[in-house]
Structure formats: structure tokens, C-alpha cells
Amino acid sequence: MGQDGSPAHKRPSGSGGGLPTTTLTNGGGRGGRGGLLPRGRQMQKTFNNIKITILCGFVTILVLRGTIGVGNLGSSSADAVNQNIIEETNRILAEIRSDSDPTDLDEPQEGDMNPNATYVLGPKITDWDSQRKVWLNQNPEFPSTVNGKARILLLTGSPPKPCDNPIGDHYLLKSVKNKIDYCRLHGIEIVYNMAHLDKELAGYWAKLPMIRRLMLSHPEVEWIWWMDSDALFTDILFQIPLARYQKHNLVIHGYPDLLFDQKSWIALNTGSFLLRNCQWSLDLLDAWAPMGPKGPIRDEAGKVLTAYLKGRPAFEADDQSALIYLLLSQKDTWMEKVFVENQYYLHGFWEGLVDRYEEMIEKYHPGLGDERWPFVTHFVGCKPCGSYADYAVERCLKSMERAFNFADNQVLKLYGFSHRGLLSPKIKRIRNETVSPLEFVDKFDIRRTPVETKPQN
């Protein structure tokens, strides 16, 4: 999709554009006698030509009848209508992707970002904890805990424009369906964002202003949980062990040895993390954001990150590398409140997981969340919405289909159905209807099933 810059193929014109012709001179033909056939032979030749013409016409009618049918000869108008719809749809999609809007003519042009100015997400707030405490006391109908559990808001999203690859929109829909299922079953609120709240922080960085805005607009929420659109819940039963994080404000998947010993750029993964709604988190976002503005600032910051972090390719600054750099370079300021989680897969890299789903089904059960039955399968590098990816498109799409159906089977089980296979959208019945349906609710309802978790080291 998109413009590739290749020239359009046009029919040649001018001296070389027509069909080849032969110019006959006055003496042309065989010995100059081309038009001197006897009258009888001329009439016979004309009659033969007429017969050939009639025969060709008859054959043409037979061919048309065999391919489109006589009754379908009138379908050309319907085809024209369909073609017009396709062209109109493509035109609208092109306009949406172009960023042009005639209603924005009166809006002033945004100036370029000053590379010498430190970027800020918004007005500096220094007393958020006290402001939030007062608000919660004044609004008891919006408690920060529900049924004894801290209130969580899951934030995810995708770009405001249609995907470059049309099938990407289909997998975005499957991804949000998967997240809605998990949140519905675990009493978690969900926000799906498709807006760039700050044009300077597009791409990887778009999550930061949205997280901050949700914190300030929903003081009743205790945790904001960011999750990339290309990450799927694959253990629908598993629950975040929030009690483990009472003294922490950031929960992120990673490995301390890769972080502190190797300074690896993949020591942490920002595709799925939890951030507590508190002053500490606002301060972290303020410290995290300055590398994010697009343009020279992001480009120069990328060079710093590549030089500092092991294994990082040379490209513009991304939010994950910037967070790792911040936690390493200001360890005393931040790390006391950061929980680097690897007891379960808050982020699970897809390549080592998707081909083992059948083995997991045979040996284990949902609710484990770790390598035995991964909580989250994250399709890093697949970019189903983009026009390019780091892995083969077919491999990515088949793997995403397997992950979605693996998770969906856990949801469908309550209703007595399952996918026919991990690559099949079709479903089959796995148990018969009964006059006592509530026994299946008690047996299969995910909300009633106890969860096994690993002990903390």
C-alpha cells in the first residue's frame, strides 16, 4: 500500500505508438499485380471472407455464453457500480492518510520544536498525591479499590489512520477483542486511543501523553496498564499479583542481569507495563519524555542511546531505550520504586511461544502465566498495520492467528465451543446443551477459577 514512487506505465504515443503498418507503393505487391484478380475469383474470395466473419461472430457468442452467460450480459452496469465504490473508498482512505482537512484552514501553523528547549508534557505538578487524596475523599462514589482490588485501567490503541496493509485493520480488531475479553472477565476498565494528543510525540512515544492525561482525568484509577496493540493476552485466567507491588510504582517485564550487568537495550520491554497513579509516576513521565520529540531532538537522542546501550541498532530514540537509559543513569532516583518482573510473562516474545501452544494444552493449563502458559504473547517486529516488518508477513499473520485462537478457546469454553484448529476461525461444539446450564457456569466460569502462581524469589 502507499506510494512507491515508481513511474506509471503509459501507452506509448507518437511515431512509435501505433500498430506497425506497411506502405505500399504503386508497384507494390507481387510484381505490381495486386488488384488484377479475375472477377470470378474476386467474388469467391469475398464470399469466403463473409463466411469467415459469420463463423468468428458465432464462435465469439459461444465463448461469451460459456464464460459469463447470456443472462449476465447486463451485469456490466453492476460491475461499473462496484468499481466506482472501490475507487471512492480508495479516494477517502487516501484523504484520511494525507493528514489534510479542509476544516483546519483557520488553524495556525505549528512552529518547529526548538532543539535547545527541554520538552515538557504539560504544566509541572508537584502535589498530585495530596490533590488526588482530597478528591477521593470528596467523591466516595469513585473508590480507588473495587471489591478489595485496586482499580486498573488498561490503555491500548493504534494510529489514527487506516493501516498501510489492509489486513492489519482486521488484526487490530482481533487484538482489541482479545483485550476486551480479558478486561471484562477481570473487572478492568479499558480505553482504546486512536488520537495523537501531542504531534511531537508520535510513534513509539504516543503512549506517554495519553498515560499522563488518563492519570489526571481518572484520579479514581490506581494503576494505568499500557499494552501495545500487537500484544495479546494468551492466558485469560491469569491475574496480575498486585499485592506483590505495594511498595512499587512501575511494574515492567525484564531481567536485572541484562539491565545492570550488560546495559542491554532489550533488558526491559515497554510493550506492557503498569504505572501507579501517583506523583512519582508524573515525575518519571516528565523525565522520560524529553528524548521523544520528533525531528533533530529524537535523532540526536538516538545516537546517545545507541552508544550507551549494548546491541542497540542506529535509529532514532525510542521510548524503551530511553527508559532503560534513564533508569541506569539515574538509578538512585528511580529504581527503588521499579519492580522488574520475570516470574510471569507480562511480555512474552512470540517466536519462542506460538509453536508450542499444542504442547502447552497437552501438558499444562491456563492460570500459570509463565513459560508453561504465557500470560501475554507480544508480536514484536511483526508490525501488521505497517507496510514493512522485521519478519516474514505470512509467518507473523499465521502466528497471530494461532495466538488469538489459543486465547479465544479459553473464552469460548464457558459457552461450550472451541475453534476447529488454532489456524481456523470456524468453531465447533465441545459439549451438548443441558436443562441444568448453571452447573457449567460453576465449572467453567473463569471468574470462579483459583489461580496458581509461582512463589516470589
Swiss-Prot record:
Topological type in the membrane: Single-pass type II membrane protein
Bilayer-crossing regions: 52-72
Bias-annotated ranges (Gly residues): 26-37
One of the GO BP terms on file: root hair elongation
Coiled-coil positions: none
Disordered as annotated region, ranges: 1-40, 97-116
Lumenal-side segments: 73-457
Phenotype of null mutants: Root hair phenotype, characterized by short root hairs with bubble-like extrusions at the tip. Alteration of the main root cellular morphology. Reduced xyloglucan content.
Catalytic activity: Transfers an alpha-D-xylosyl residue from UDP-D-xylose to a glucose residue in xyloglucan, forming an alpha-(1->6)-D-xylosyl-D-glucose linkage
Cellular component aspect of the GO annotation: endosome; Golgi apparatus; Golgi membrane; Golgi trans cisterna; trans-Golgi network
GO molecular function, one term: xyloglucan 6-xylosyltransferase activity
Superkingdom: Eukaryota
Positions of glycan attachment: 116, 432
Predominant cellular place of this UniProt entry's protein: Golgi
Tissue: Highly expressed in roots, stems and cauline leaves, and at lower levels in rosette leaves, flowers and siliques.
Keywords: Glycoprotein, Glycosyltransferase, Golgi apparatus, Membrane, Signal-anchor, Transferase, Transmembrane, Transmembrane helix
Cytoplasmic side stretches: 1-51
InterPro entries: Glyco_trans_34, Nucleotide-diphossugar_trans
Subunit relationships: Interacts with XXT2 and CSLC4. Interacts with FUT1 and XLT2.
PANTHER family tied to this protein: XYLOGLUCAN 6-XYLOSYLTRANSFERASE 5-RELATED, XYLOGLUCAN 6-XYLOSYLTRANSFERASE 5-RELATED-RELATED
UniProt function note: Probable xyloglucan xylosyltransferase involved in the biosynthesis of xyloglucan in roots. May act in association with XXT1 and XXT2. Associates with other xyloglucan-synthesizing enzymes to form multiprotein complexes for xyloglucan synthesis in the Golgi.
Family under the similarity heading: Belongs to the glycosyltransferase 34 family.
Protein name in UniProt: Probable xyloglucan 6-xylosyltransferase 5
Species per Swiss-Prot/TrEMBL record: Arabidopsis thaliana
Gene name per UniProt: XXT5
